[in-house]
Amino acid sequence: VNAEIIHFDIDRGTMVSRYIDNGITLDIAALKDEAVLNRTGHAFRQLHDCGQAFSGEFELFQQIDQYLSVLNELGVELPSGYTEVQKDAERLRTALTSHPLPNRPCHCDPMVENCVDNGKKVFIIDFEYAGNNDPMWDLGDLSVEGDFTEEQEYIFMTAYFGHEPTPFDVGRMVMYKAMCDLLWTLWGVVQHANNNPVDDFWTYAVDRLNRCRTLMSSAEFPKHLSAVQRGPNE
């Protein structure tokens, strides 16, 4: 799944990986290609089905609670409307935890640029945030980062599952699309509070929140939430 690791020093935190010949770092435009989407779906399925486990867990709701605690201690104001969206998201928390999937080894930060395509397969790189997690998180987060259309999501998920995704699978992926934007909203506010100079993280956080709110208020969202609430066998 990853580029071959040639050397890793756990004490220094340094790693050397083999160069990916003919590798192209993916971007939003590249993922509009059906063949690339198929290879990407296969890559994430290979990761999730590898049979190994990371040493740490990626706990979405614990992370949200931790970020909120940090921001409360810092006395940082949240973007306008965040509290209302957070309250509304409790429905998602209840639905997702009512029918949990077994945790799998997940990337947890599937930026489009963390995927490298050599024309034959897609490699997934940069496992800084990796942990054991609901595999639908990776699919939902990549959909957000790749600005997928519904058609792209269908192609990607069909490649991932090897068959047409069920309403439960699609619904779960959509729930994580909303939740990843909610989580990264808080992450952005933390970066802003710490005066991270790399980017305008306040604007980043506001944009994430607005996208989350737009998705959760869309006409199709209740259908997806209902599919998750009913469970995988309905």
Label for each model-derived stretch:
Residues V1-F61, Y67-T83:
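ATP-binding pocket architecture of kinase catalytic cores
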Residues I5, R91-L139:
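Active-site acidic catalytic loop and adjacent metal/ATP-binding pocket
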Residues I24, F44-Q52, L96, G146, ...:
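A general structural signal marking secondary-structure boundaries and capping sites
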Residues E34, F123, G140-L142, A159, ...:
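Glycine-rich, phosphate-binding/catalytic loops in enzymes
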Residues R39, A43, E84, D88, ...:
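Charged catalytic carboxylate motif
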Residues D49-C108, N118-G119, T158, P165-P167, ...:
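An alpha-helical support segment within catalytic cores of ATP-dependent transferases
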Residues E73-V76, S80, W187-E234:
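ATP/Mg2+ or Mg2+-diphosphate-binding catalytic cores
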Residues M136-F168, A178-N196, R211:
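Active-site activation/catalytic loop segments of kinase-like enzymes and analogous catalytic loops
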